[in-house]
């Protein structure tokens, strides 16, 4: 292995006290169609798009039955309206970039966080920090802020700050970087074709800056990165 992650003593002690089912409940995020018993044992719960009232009721019900505090998550990449019927839906991250106003992207994140937290969510799967390197990419398109890494970083970072400043955990996606392939990573393992230097100077730079600036979560995509294999 190229990198070794050091063990945290407190985490290790907690893990050693868990059986397999308890451990899986800490690292797997079930969705709301799972049985109520299974959901209430988990530490995370993904809720599919629904109305404001239905989502709020489900979150309150699961919370009341759970043995511990849970984190509720859904995909609000374009604002809370992406998942919550009746909440504000914003245009794409590309639109935020084309508007040329970093503060607008920040306010998008702020509004998304405010509406999501009112329902009971703690976490969202966004923003998308992919670079549009191939205009025929079926996954990226206008979800990407730009073809330019600096614009991608500028506007998605503003959106992330808006989310996290107002209490909603942000998620960067899709590591190690989509946008250079013509394949849908949900259907096949797509390949990021960049050389090590190209990746370091683009996606590597973007993710490094986000980590330094306090992003909480990074989502891995179904994407290979041959430049960083074991060779």
State the predicted function of each range:
Residues 1-42, 49:
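Preference for extracellular/luminal or secreted protein segments
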Residues 6, 31-34, 76, 108, ...:
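Short secondary-structure boundary/capping elements
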Residues 17, 61, 115, 162, ...:
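A generic secondary-structure signal
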Residues 19, 75, 116, 203, ...:
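Divalent metal-coordination and catalytic microenvironments
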Residues 20-26, 43, 67-70, 120-122, ...:
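Short, well-ordered coil/turn segments that N-cap beta-strands
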Residues 36-155, 174, 179-193, 221-231:
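Enzymes and membrane/adaptor proteins characterized by extended Gly/Ser/Thr/Asp/Glu-rich
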Residues 163-172, 198, 202-217:
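Phosphate/pyrophosphate-binding betaalpha-module
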């Amino acid at each position: 292995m190229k990198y070794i992650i050091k063990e945290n003593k407190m985490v290790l002690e907690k893990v050693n006290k868990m059986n397999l089912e308890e451990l899986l409940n800490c690292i797997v995020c079930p969705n709301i169609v799972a049985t109520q018993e299974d959901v209430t044992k988990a530490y995370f719960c993904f809720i599919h798009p629904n109305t404001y009232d239905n989502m709020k009721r489900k979150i309150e019900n699961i919370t009341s039955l759970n043995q511990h505090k849970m984190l509720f998550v859904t995909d609000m990449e374009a604002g809370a309206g992406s998942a919550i019927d009746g909440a504000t839906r914003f245009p794409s991250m590309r639109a935020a970039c084309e508007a040329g106003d970093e503060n607008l992207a920040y306010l998008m994140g702020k509004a998304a966080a405010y509406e999501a937290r009112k329902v009971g969510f703690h976490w969202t799967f966004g923003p998308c920090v992919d670079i549009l390197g191939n205009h025929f990419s079926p996954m990226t398109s206008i979800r990407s802020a730009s073809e330019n890494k600096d614009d991608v970083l500028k506007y998605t970072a503003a959106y992330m700050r808006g989310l996290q400043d107002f209490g909603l955990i942000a998620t960067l996606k899709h590591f190690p970087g989509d946008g250079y392939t013509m394949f849908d990573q949900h259907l096949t393992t797509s390949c990021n074709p960049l050389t090590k230097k190209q990746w370091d100077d683009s996606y590597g730079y973007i993710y490094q800056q986000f980590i330094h600036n306090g992003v909480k979560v990074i989502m891995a995509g179904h994407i290979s990165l041959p430049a960083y294999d074991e060779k």
